[in-house]
């Protein structure tokens, strides 16, 4: 089968002929229709320090996808041939304390599709049936292929009550932009998103952000005054992993504010903890998606009218994968989709 593999321990990704994956008794075999390129895939492509420590070589990568069930393990119930599915990319152990308590998203033994095991940049993928999610008929393949990152946005945004609240999002990558759309859809008042990438900020405006602020040109506190905000943001969603962005968030949070952190800093990050203490801030770390509460909310949000389609800006055939990775690496894109049909 065709597959994109991290074939060598150097920058790049390679289109290869790989063996079709072998299915177990509790697995599904999925014929991939579309995949999307994630920021994690770009880290792997660029072979940065994290990738060098994490990714086995050679390995098929990728974890954002939609496909069709073409074979079913003999112990699997609830799926049939032809079901359209995406899937949770975090494979959990099932026996740790959190798994047994129903908090599978907090499994300490998580294995990542396309990170620790064979991924979805291939014509076929095998995953445990437990991890598969049936896609409703009224949700397109394009949208289904980005459910993984959309789930990060939904999990982060819905960590706290948003109705009538003022929300600051730091980092206008695709996940931050989708989070802005979610916040507006569920009833936040002002949703302000910050970045220095004007292309991405314009996407955020199209997706419903009240204000998309280029912090290299505008002062965030001036924007707050312009919006009539006198007491700071009620909810903060940190999506960038950039220390200066997090510092700006702490400076502008209201007393009693709540912060959800999805962005991963590149190293240790010093902050002024006195601001956290005296403001009484709540800070919550976010990793992945809640299984499977986030997935049901994703589908329901789209079915109730949330439009995240503007975040998809580029489509390529799999043979043109290099153009897709170039587009994603340029910073002048939203989500990039590769078609395997």
Curated annotation (Swiss-Prot):
**Catalytic residue list:** 40 (charge relay system), 43 (charge relay system)
User: Where does it primarily localize?
Assistant: cytoplasm
Binding residues for NAD(+), per the UniProt record?
175, 195, 200, 262-264, 286-287
Q: What is its EC number?
A: 1.1.1.103
- Binding positions (Zn(2+) 1): 38, 63-64
Q: Give the UniProt subcellular location, in the record's own words.
A: Cytoplasm
Q: Which HAMAP family match?
A: Thr_dehydrog
* Function, in words: Catalyzes the NAD(+)-dependent oxidation of L-threonine to 2-amino-3-ketobutyrate.
Q: What is this protein called?
A: L-threonine 3-dehydrogenase
């Amino acid at each position: 089968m065709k597959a994109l593999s991290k074939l060598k321990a150097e920058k790049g990704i390679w289109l290869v002929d790989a063996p079709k994956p072998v299915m177990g008794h509790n697995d599904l075999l999925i014929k991939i229709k579309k995949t999307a390129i994630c920021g994690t895939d770009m880290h792997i492509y660029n072979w940065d320090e994290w990738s060098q420590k994490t990714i086995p070589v050679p390995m098929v990568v990728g974890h954002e996808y939609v496909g069709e069930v073409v074979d079913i393990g003999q112990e699997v119930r609830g799926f049939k041939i032809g079901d359209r599915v995406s899937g949770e990319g975090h494979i959990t152990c099932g026996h740790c304390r959190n798994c047994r308590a129903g908090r599978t998203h907090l499994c300490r033994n998580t294995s990542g599709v396309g990170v620790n095991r064979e991924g979805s940049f291939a014509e076929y993928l095998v995953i445990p049936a437990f991890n598969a999610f049936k896609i409703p008929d009224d949700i397109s393949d394009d949208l289904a292929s980005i459910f993984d990152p959309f789930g990060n946005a939904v999990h982060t945004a819905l960590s706290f009550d948003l109705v009538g609240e003022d929300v600051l999002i730091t980092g206008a990558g695709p996940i931050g932009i989708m989070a802005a759309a979610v916040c507006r859809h569920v009833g936040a008042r002002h949703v302000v998103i910050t970045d220095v990438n004007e292309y991405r900020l314009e996407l955020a405006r199209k997706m419903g952000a009240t204000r998309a602020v280029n912090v290299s040109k505008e002062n965030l506190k001036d924007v707050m005054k312009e919006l009539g905000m006198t007491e700071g943001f009620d909810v903060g969603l940190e999506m960038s992993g950039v220390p200066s962005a997090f510092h700006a968030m702490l400076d502008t949070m209201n007393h009693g504010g709540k912060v959800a952190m999805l962005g991963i800093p590149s190293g240790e990050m010093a902050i002024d903890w006195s601001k956290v203490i005296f403001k009484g801030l709540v800070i919550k770390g976010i990793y992945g998606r809640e299984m499977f509460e986030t997935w049901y909310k994703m589908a329901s949000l789209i079915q109730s009218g949330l439009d995240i389609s503007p975040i998809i800006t580029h489509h390529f055939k799999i043979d043109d994968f290099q153009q897709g990775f170039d587009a994603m690496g340029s910073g002048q894109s939203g989500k990039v989709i590769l078609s395997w049909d």
